[in-house]
């Protein structure tokens, strides 16, 4: 394999790597966006309606009925409420700590891990563009140094490759940066909504488990 063949191979591989980074970054953004939507209620009104239904069951001491309301609901508040109900015998303080830890581990850590991949794509895309720029300029100057007469078309192809890879890298990174900003806003709103919902639930839950604790 001569240098021209090697250059062509690496050039095509650079395009392939850029396409892969763009696809993976976009895929992770879509996953995070859907994950946040899956874990939160549409608005505070919908969440309060669910919590009111839950409070009616808890106020009657109907823990099984309350658990059935949460069952099958993949949102964070119902899942954490069900966890609290199933572990009510360990005491209110431990239950509160348990659901806080589980929210951080099961929801926030998962989102942070996926978001890390998006940040990696944002950093990698321009670097691949810079790599393509270096390859293109090396090829162009290599032809200038070794040929008596240089074909302007060949030089234009090398310089074009350098500029195209740079443009692709920036075009990949910039929308992902905007998407990350939007995702961070959605995550922050989800945290605020879940925190408000859990505070509401814990007040009702504490009152419901108090008579049980006194009996023991």
Enumerate the language-model features and the residues they cover.
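Short, charge-rich amphipathic segments
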Residues: 6, 31-35, 127-136, 166
